[in-house]
């Protein structure tokens, strides 16, 4: 990652291709969250996913180094000069959305974020939380999500994103009921 930042002086952050201890690649290159993305993430089926394909937060795993909106923080390198300019991590976030917010602030300051496929890192997920499988979304994730939307888009947008999330979930459940 350091080599990438040294050869790309206009890049603010660089992150690795990440895979699990089972060898499976993880989706760690993302678009910024949006109202449309919230709806698609919950509805998650054919026509809706197709309609919002360019809004889906988790991008397909890139096979080449590419600029992205944000990266998973499990393996990310950033320039000190960028942090001096935009500030450090917002400590209000807990485990989720902090790197999303940081990359967004960098992007608005003119510093792109690159996914560097040549840098490869094994990530053993859920060690910090002890939750391999989520039975339900934890409160700290919801708190961080709400803080992200409110901080970066305002209370009205955060409310609309939440309503969109709920509407997508209702549509998904209705689809399951009809199919069964």
Q: Which role fits each region the language model picked out?
A:
Residues 29-35, 132-133:
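Short, hinge-like loop/turn segments at secondary-structure boundaries
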Residues 104-179:
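Active-site-adjacent helix/loop segment of glycosyltransferases
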Residues 28, 38, 42, 85-86, ...:
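Residues that scaffold the ATP/ADP-binding catalytic core of kinase and kinase-like folds
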Residues 16, 41, 173-176:
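Structural signal for membrane-spanning alpha-helices in multi-pass inner-membrane proteins
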Residues 61-63, 67-120:
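A short, conserved alpha-helix in the catalytic core of glycosyltransferases
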Residues 33-69:
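Short, flexible, basic/aromatic active-site loop/helix in glycosyltransferases
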Residues 1-31:
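Conserved donor NDP-sugar-binding/catalytic core segment of glycosyltransferases
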